[in-house]
Amino acid sequence: MTDVASSIAAGMQAQTPGVVLASASPARVAVLRSAGVAFTQKPASVDERSVHAALQKEGELTLPGDIAELLAITKATEVSTGDPDALVIGADQMLAFEDRTLEKPVDFDAARNQLLELRGNTHVLHSAVCLCRGGQHVWTHVDTATMMMRDFSPEFVGRYLSVAGASVLTSVGAY
């Protein structure tokens, strides 16, 4: 490549905003990589449990999809204010089961209990994604998936947890 062509290519790359994933989620990283998206990862420092608890206490945004959307916006906005030229992706999920919202399990006992509670039952996963640039959200989307978890034994859960390992603690469904 000639010096002129190299300069033009470098200039074009410098003008193209980068894509930043505001998440530590291995699953989200895998999705972007498998789609061939070039990105950097800068996890947001949002305390999801505190935000969720505050919303419930105030009696606002108690619908799981709304909470997931607010968390996705909060994460993307936080990271995009520090990298204003980047297109920042924030995402979150909330799981609705019966009349309550479940969060990521805090340990393996909580994961075991959650899986045993979900087995043989239907639950709804609310997924939200937000794109931000310069601290402003430019696009959001929320979708839901209604899922039926098959019935299984407590022994199966034990084997599953030993094989899946700590990854179950990064998912609201422990799966």
Model-found features: residue ranges?
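Glycine-rich, phosphate-binding/catalytic loops in enzymes
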Residues: 37-40, 106-108
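Surface-exposed, flexible loop/turn segments at secondary-structure boundaries
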Residues: 27, 47-49, 137
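Cofactor-binding loop segments of dinucleotide-utilizing enzymes, especially the Rossmann-like FAD-
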Residues: 24, 44, 134
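Anionic-ligand binding patches
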Residues: 2-19, 58-175
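N-terminal beta1-alpha1 ligand-phosphate binding loop
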Residues: 6-38
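A short beta-strand-loop structural module common to alpha/beta enzyme folds
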Residues: 38-50
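Short, charged, surface-exposed secondary-structure boundary motifs
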Residues: 49-56, 116
